[in-house]
């Protein structure tokens, strides 16, 4: 296990011990990380991973902790949050963004530079790293449509670049998940557009999101993947599950595809409610819902 003294001499690194992850997750649930680290440079991240490897320390890397539930027992070993790796650069029609850059901010950079194609992501919570990891998407667009390459690091600290085809994108899936890689940055190829039209489209999508999604409460975003031929929210509605609550977490009355933390709920409440919804939807429609949200950590 990595020791505090192992981390003291790594520059550009903030470290916290026994830190509640509920302070950082969008759901506002999650037990403590043994060690929580915030590298501000690629060099700091590299050194951190090398130290973890040499001390046989388990590593969990998080982007912006949005489409995620951390269990109440927390996460053992080292947890790395990439939120300080947030630079965004523009060159011609290409945007390169580091893993910790927020999607919303990257879409604003695209608009300011008259680049279109990234509008779909303007309301998706979370970071570039997390979005690439799960091929995030909304309103007919997804990351795989605009990504041209991705810089990644393995657990030994080796850096490589994957092309879009090497990313093996699927629905809410990429090779990053399979190979335990860390996203460092991603390059996106966009097209020339009119900044006013781009902003109008982003305004339209944000209005749709705000009118349909329960943004007033903590949540993990969309809980379930879209089943083939169906909509998860519609199936949940048809099973009369809207408003059903376990502990402090309920199926949103505004959008059945969301579960919101309305009364200081915990991760156990989320897991129980997810299991309950899966059972009842299966019973009502015969369709088995598959969670889109990642659930990690110890109970």
From Swiss-Prot:
Keyword Flavoprotein assigned: yes
Enzyme Commission code(s) on record: 1.3.1.98
Molecular function per GO: FAD binding; UDP-N-acetylmuramate dehydrogenase activity
Record-level GO cellular component terms: cytosol
Cysteines engaged in disulfide bonds, as pairs: none
InterPro entries: FAD-bd_PCMH, FAD-bd_PCMH-like_sf, FAD-bd_PCMH_sub1, FAD-bd_PCMH_sub2, MurB, MurB_C, MurB_C_sf, Oxid_FAD_bind_N
Superkingdom, natural source: Bacteria
Domain called FAD-binding PCMH-type: residue spans: 28-193
Compartments, as annotated in UniProt: Cytoplasm
Residue numbers annotated as active site: 172, 222, 292
Reactions catalysed according to its record: UDP-N-acetyl-alpha-D-muramate + NADP(+) = UDP-N-acetyl-3-O-(1-carboxyvinyl)-alpha-D-glucosamine + NADPH + H(+)
PROSITE patterns, per the entry: FAD_PCMH (PS51387)
Cofactor requirement: FAD
Record-level GO BP terms: cell division; cell wall organization; peptidoglycan biosynthetic process; regulation of cell shape
Keywords: Cell cycle, Cell division, Cell shape, Cell wall biogenesis/degradation, Cytoplasm, FAD, Flavoprotein, NADP, Oxidoreductase, Peptidoglycan synthesis
This protein's pathway: Cell wall biogenesis; peptidoglycan biosynthesis
Family membership noted in the UniProt record: Belongs to the MurB family.
Name of the protein this chain belongs to: UDP-N-acetylenolpyruvoylglucosamine reductase
């Amino acid at each position: 296990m990595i020791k505090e003294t192992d981390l003291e001499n790594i520059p550009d690194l903030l470290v916290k011990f026994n830190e509640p992850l509920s302070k950082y997750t969008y759901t506002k649930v999650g037990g403590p990380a043994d060690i929580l680290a915030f590298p501000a440079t690629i060099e700091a991240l590299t050194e951190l991973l090398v130290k973890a490897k040499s001390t046989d320390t388990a590593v969990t890397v998080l982007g912006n902790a949005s489409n995620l539930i951390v269990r109440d027992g927390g996460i053992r070993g080292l947890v790395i949050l990439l939120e300080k790796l947030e630079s965004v650069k523009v060159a011609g029609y290409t945007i390169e963004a580091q893993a910790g850059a927020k999607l919303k901010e990257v879409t604003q950079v695209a608009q300011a530079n008259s680049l279109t194609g990234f509008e779909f992501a303007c309301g998706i919570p979370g970071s570039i790293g997390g979005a690439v990891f799960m091929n995030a998407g909304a309103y007919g667009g997804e990351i795989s449509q605009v990504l041209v390459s991705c810089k990644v690091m393995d657990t030994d600290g080796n850096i490589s670049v994957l092309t879009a085809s090497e990313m093996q994108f699927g629905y809410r899936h990429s090779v990053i998940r399979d190979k335990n890689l860390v996203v460092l940055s991603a390059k996106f190829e966009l097209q020339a557009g009119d900044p006013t039209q781009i902003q109008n489209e982003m305004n339209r999508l944000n209005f749709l999101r705000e009118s349909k999604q329960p943004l007033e409460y903590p949540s993990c975003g969309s809980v379930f993947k879209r089943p083939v031929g169906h909509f998860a929210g519609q199936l949940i509605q048809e099973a009369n599950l809207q408003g059903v609550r376990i502990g402090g977490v309920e199926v949103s009355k505004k959008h059945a595809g969301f579960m919101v933390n309305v009364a200081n709920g915990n991760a156990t409440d989320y897991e129980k409610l997810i299991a309950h919804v899966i059972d009842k939807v299966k019973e009502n429609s015969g369709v088995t819902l598959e969670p889109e949200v990642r659930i990690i950590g110890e109970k």
